[in-house]
Amino acid sequence: MLPSWTIGLLLLATVRGKEICYEPFGCFSDEKPWTGILQRPLKLFPWSPEDIDAHFLLYTNENPNNYQRINITDLATVRASNFQLDRKTRFVIHGFIDDGDSGWPTDLCKKMFKVEKVNCICVDWEHGAWTKYTQAVHNTRVVGAEIAFFIQGLSTELGYGPENVHLIGHSLGAQLAAEAGRRLGGQVGRITGLDPAQPCFEGTPEEVRLDPSDAMFVDVIHTDSASIIPFLSLGIRQKVGHLDFYPNGGKEMPGCQKNILSTIIDINGIWQGIQDFVACSHLRSYKYYSSSILNPDGFLGYPCASYEEFQEGGCFPCPAGGCPKMGHYADQFQGKTSAVGQTFFLNTGSSGNFTSWRYRVSVTLAGTKKVRGSIRIALYGSNGNSKQYQIFKGSLQPNASHTHDIDVDLNVGKVQKVKFLWNNNVINLFWPKLGASRVTVQGGEDRTEYNFCSNDTMRENALQTLYPC
């Protein structure tokens, strides 16, 4: 992938005509800002709809496993299908060197059917996506125009308004969705950008890339947003939505540091393994979204100016107005989806369903002597127990307090007790004892505080249990 577009961007191109038209989808210019700018020096036209050969594959709750193919220029195929006018319609759009008739797009539809009645349309434009990157960039314009034409037809012929439509696009698919939204004057109900493509889009004018004006609500998940040079990142860095989420800082995702062999020999197959090695962080965006459908509370985004401030605890807990949920339910952030450029940060798990719940833990120490070591806390709640998390490492002094935010991989529910452990891994002939006299735990979402107390002190590596004060 990378050599084709990086080398291609350096090539000189022959000046061509100013536009090409593909009826009934409109005309496409090869003038600025579409080409001839710093990010797009090549003059290219998009391929024709016939060459791209995009397919629109409808899945519904009535046919979750076998699609019904829709002809977007013949709405009789919609009337003859399981498409329901009283349901929301979500389009799922893949990106570069991907396809839409299997894999994550169809899996996304199936998860939606578990929580809602919905028309789910996978847009398979693989013929236009499996080519040189710069050509695929321009091909998105035609597929975007096709989607816009289809949505407009649903509105004029079936009375199905564009506000009922949600476009979900990964990588180039997100920029493709933006083109559809732009052509509809921003009347689409929602666009979700899953790590929108960076090359040929970062820093371009608004009409070229995803922008808040493309839909009534635009939410974005950034997972591979470091700079192209030297990191070869694929996702856009700039804020391009109403709500922009940067999980784990938005640059490198946990669990994406595996070695080459273990990644390529992936349990999901060789091709999936190769994709995960080349673009692991880039792919996490749709994996997070997919998991959020069934785990809505495990992806809470905290409003913050930077990831560094978030990590230092400066943006905890959620403000009085609450925090949005990254992913499928981001539009439930009531009354706060119209302001543009809002940034949110969170940490995720490294595997499994990637969920995480943030807690602030404060520990006040008890004992008679100062020692060096580390202290750890485990939470025990109505929904389950957490593993032990390190709160502090260094000089442990009686009566000193230490506070740290932890990201727990399950929602423990109402915290009922905590367990404290300390160690220094050094032989000490005096067998010092240390304990926690008070532990305070605060949940990030509801801001509830739980207080636990004890008069005990323990030798190292011995668990101390604290109960509500």
From Swiss-Prot:
Residues annotated as the enzyme's active site: 171 (nucleophile), 195 (charge relay system), 282 (charge relay system)
Main location: secreted
Residue ranges of every copy of the PLAT domain listed in the record: 357-469
Protein species of origin: Bos taurus (Bovine)
Protein name (database record): Pancreatic lipase-related protein 2
Endpoints of the signal sequence: 1-17
Residues holding Ca(2+): 206, 209, 211, 214
Biological process per Gene Ontology, one example term: fatty acid biosynthetic process
Cysteines paired by S-S bonds: 21-27, 109-120, 256-280, 304-315, 318-323, 453-469
Catalytic activity: a triacylglycerol + H2O = a diacylglycerol + a fatty acid + H(+); a 1,2-diacyl-3-O-(beta-D-galactosyl)-sn-glycerol + 2 H2O = 3-beta-D-galactosyl-sn-glycerol + 2 a fatty acid + 2 H(+); 1,2,3-tri-(9Z-octadecenoyl)-glycerol + H2O = di-(9Z)-octadecenoylglycerol + (9Z)-octadecenoate + H(+); di-(9Z)-octadecenoylglycerol + H2O = (9Z-octadecenoyl)-glycerol + (9Z)-octadecenoate + H(+)
GO CC, any one term: zymogen granule membrane
Alphabetized Gene3D superfamilies for the sequence: alpha/beta hydrolase, PLAT/LH2 domain
Keywords tagged on the record: Calcium, Cell projection, Cytoplasmic vesicle, Disulfide bond, Glycoprotein, Hydrolase, Lipid degradation, Lipid metabolism, Membrane, Metal-binding, Secreted, Signal
Compartments where located: Secreted; Zymogen granule membrane; Cell projection, Neuron projection
Gene this chain is encoded by: PNLIPRP2
EC numbers: 3.1.1.26, 3.1.1.3
Pfam family, one: PLAT
Glycosylation site list: 71, 353, 399, 455
Topology of this chain in the membrane: Peripheral membrane protein
Assigned protein family: Belongs to the AB hydrolase superfamily. Lipase family.
Gene Ontology molecular-function annotations: calcium ion binding; galactolipase activity; lipoprotein lipase activity; monoacylglycerol lipase activity; phospholipase A1 activity; phospholipase activity; triacylglycerol lipase activity
Region of interest (Required for galactolipase activity), residue spans: 93-105, 257-279
Pathway: Glycerolipid metabolism; triacylglycerol degradation; Glycolipid metabolism
